[in-house]
UniProtKB/Swiss-Prot annotation:
It is a multi-pass membrane protein. Keywords: Cell membrane, Disulfide bond, G-protein coupled receptor, Glycoprotein, Lipoprotein, Membrane, Palmitate, Receptor, Transducer, Transmembrane, Transmembrane helix. The chain crosses the membrane at residues 35-55, 71-91, 110-131, 152-172, 198-218, 248-268, 271-291. Receptor for the hormone galanin. The activity of this receptor is mediated by G proteins that inhibit adenylate cyclase activity. A lipid is attached at residue 319 (S-palmitoyl cysteine). Belongs to the G-protein coupled receptor 1 family. Expression is detected in brain, spinal cord, heart and skeletal muscle. It is found in: Cell membrane. Interacts with GRP39 AND HTR1A. This is Galanin receptor type 1. GO terms for molecular function: galanin receptor activity; neuropeptide binding; peptide hormone binding.
Length: 348
């Protein structure tokens, strides 16, 4: 589901949209829309760069050495975020830049559908990562048999299949509508309003609330276990496990904050009288931008909280400079620079 599908100023509801707060035009569009487009542009640029860098770092593991389950889940999260940024934000930006929908029926269905798929893949992947951390720390003796690449890949496949299935009603009910004023809008239309209410509730419960509760449960167990076992762990092992848990926990908290306003808007619009005021307009736009920004903040979190990722980032740039260095370098330097980064560099 997409914020623009509710009866909001983007015009994707079942009734004529109310006018947004009056503002002076700037470059042919309203000031609010112009600012929103600038924010979209920043989110897009930061997200594409950051997620591409994360994918590059994780892809440069030593040949023949299996990737950690944590890294596979992070890789899946980055791929979903990057695909969303590339396939959704540029098209959705036209809603703010143009007075009518010009991209056709397929794009209308696809961007709203993939928006929901990406949201679900993200939360389900974060839930899987929390379970992975729980098994690694609380059940460390059994984790070696459970936390293998094969199981992680099966989990990733299941996450995508479940997300694609859960988002299918969005693609089915998203339609183009034409007005007498020669304007076209990409709207969501459900023949039965009760079905739409049920879908909104199910998406909130199964695509937000329950995964967050599972995540909270796993991290409560992890923190309790670390507190009890603190004295029996080596300082290096203790610091490594705490840092990994901290990184994933921050990613989860940011996700929860980023998507909560989105769900509040949808539930409010379906079950209450959503006010059409300048304040509510600002809240909707803020919810919209927060939801989009979640796809670009995870690489920043890795960079600030994970020392191993920072080292891996530097290694990527170092190898890039190395590849473009003159061939007249000594054999010793060339051999050292051409060595691929160790897999340990990418273990968050």
């Amino acid at each position: 589901m997409e914020l623009a599908m509710v009866n909001l100023s983007e015009g994707n509801g079942s009734d004529p949209e109310p006018p947004a707060p009056e503002s002076r035009p700037l470059f042919g569009i309203g000031v609010e829309n112009f600012i929103t487009l600038v924010v979209f542009g920043l989110i897009f640029a930061m997200g594409v760069l950051g997620n591409s860098l994360v994918i590059t770092v994780l892809a440069r593991s030593k040949p023949g050495k299996p990737r950690s389950t944590t890294n596979l889940f992070i890789l899946n999260l980055s791929i979903a975020d990057l695909a969303y940024l590339l396939f959704c934000i540029p098209f959705q930006a036209t809603v703010y830049a143009l007075p009518t929908w010009v991209l056709g029926a397929f794009i209308c269905k696809f961007i709203h559908y993939f928006f929901t798929v990406s949201m679900l893949v993200s939360i389900f992947t974060l839930a899987a990562m929390s379970v992975d951390r729980y098994v690694a720390i609380v059940h460390s003796r059994r984790s070696s048999s459970l936390r293998v690449s094969r199981n992680a890949l099966l989990g990733v496949g299941f996450i995508w299949a479940l997300s694609i299935a859960m988002a299918s009603p969005v693609a089915y009910h998203q339609r183009l509508f034409h007005r007498d004023s020669n304007q076209t809008f990409c709207w969501e239309q459900w023949p039965n309003k009760l079905h739409k209410k049920a879908y909104v509730v199910c998406t909130f419960v199964f695509g937000y609330l329950l995964p967050l509760l599972l995540i909270c449960f796993c991290y409560a167990k992890v923190l309790n276990h670390l507190h009890k076992k603190l004295k029996n762990m080596s300082k290096k092992s203790e610091a490594s496990k705490k840092k990994t848990a901290q990184t994933v926990l921050v990613v989860v908290v940011v996700f929860g904050i980023s998507w909560l306003p989105h769900h509040v808007v949808h539930l409010w619009a379906e079950f209450g009288a959503f006010p059409l005021t300048p304040a509510s307009f600002f809240f909707r736009i803020t919810a919209h931008c927060l939801a989009y920004s979640n796809s670009s903040v995870n690489p920043i979190i890795y960079a600030f909280l994970s020392e191993n990722f920072r080292k891996a980032y530097k290694q990527v740039f170092k190898c890039h400079v190395c590849d473009e260095s003159p061939r007249s370098e000594t054999k010793e330097n060339k051999s050292r620079m051409d060595t691929p980064p160790s897999t340990n560099c990418t273990h968050v």
